[in-house]
Each structure stands twice: as C-alpha cells, then as structure tokens.
C-alpha cells in the first residue's frame, strides 16, 4: 500500500510561479503570501497578488478564517494546473491573515532560507 504523506509547503514568492518554473507543477505543495485582491463567497475562490503577479486560491477547505480584500494572507496547499489554459490554482489546506508582515523582509528570508539549505546540502555531501 502506498504511503500517503502531506508534504510541507515550499515558501515561494508569486514572482517565482510561472509556467516554466520548477514550482509550476501539478500537486506541488507551496506556501504563498500575498494581498487578497478579490474573493467570492459563493465559489470560495480568492485571488492574491504580489509584485504584479496573481494566483487563484481555492479556500473551500479552510474554516474559521474571514477573508477581507486588501489584507495579506498566507496559504499552504497544493497547486493544480487547469487544462487547457494551463492556469494555476492553489487548493489551500490552511490559511491565515498575516497583516502587518513586512513583505520585503519576508522575501529576503525566503532567499536566506534557500541559501542556508543549499549550504547545508553541500556540507552534508562532503561528510
């Protein structure tokens, strides 16, 4: 029997999510943080935006979060690529309001985390 495991959401910026990127794959687990630009209660679909890039978020599995357009949210979930238009939508498994976050500092922490993990991988290969 196949082992079912929930993968951690890889933190990315919306600028890194485009059709030829490593993150633009069906089922990949992602963590995204951006401003909510629109939300439909009827469909539970929101649109987040950061740096001129946007992403649809399906929030049907999220409870106890009230969505306010203009607030900043962080979502963790799996990316689905809708065919035939190759449009990405994140099926969120969790989400939270992170108003007050410094987005420039957040982007920098993502860069530093990747640098650290890369250095750790390299040092582990030497041992």
Curated annotation (Swiss-Prot):
MF GO annotations: protein folding chaperone; single-stranded DNA binding; telomerase inhibitor activity
Subunit structure: Component of the CST complex, composed of CTC1, TEN1 and STN1. Interacts with STN1. No interaction with POT1A, but competes with it for STN1 binding.
Cellular localisation: Nucleus; Chromosome, Telomere
Described function: Required for the maintenance of meristems and stem cells through the reduction of DNA damage. Promotes telomere integrity by maintaining telomere length and proper architecture of the chromosome terminus. Negatively regulates telomerase repeat addition processivity. Hampers contacts between enzymatically active telomerase and CST complex.
Tissue localization of expression: Ubiquitous. High expression in meristematic tissues and in vasculature.
Keywords, sorted A to Z: Chromosome, Nucleus, Telomere
Domain of life: Eukaryota
InterPro entries: NA-bd_OB-fold (IPR012340), Ten1_animal_plant (IPR029146)
Gene Ontology biological process terms from the UniProt entry: response to heat; shoot system development; stem cell population maintenance; telomere maintenance
Disulfide bonds: none
Protein's name in the database: CST complex subunit TEN1
Family label: Belongs to the TEN1 family.
A GO CC term assigned to this protein in UniProt: CST complex
């Amino acid at each position: 029997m196949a082992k079912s495991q929930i993968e951690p959401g890889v933190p990315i910026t919306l600028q890194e999510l485009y059709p030829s990127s490593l993150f633009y794959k069906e089922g990949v687990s992602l963590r995204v943080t951006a401003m909510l630009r629109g939300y439909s209660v009827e469909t539970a679909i929101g649109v987040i935006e950061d740096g001129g890039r946007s992403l649809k978020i399906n929030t049907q599995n999220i409870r106890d979060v009230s969505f306010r357009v203009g607030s900043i949210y962080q979502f963790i979930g799996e990316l689905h690529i809708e065919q035939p238009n190759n449009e990405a939508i994140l099926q969120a498994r969790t989400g939270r309001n992170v108003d007050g976050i410094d987005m420039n500092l957040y982007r920098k922490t993502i860069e530093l985390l990747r640098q650290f993990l890369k250095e750790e991988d390299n040092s582990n290969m030497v041992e």
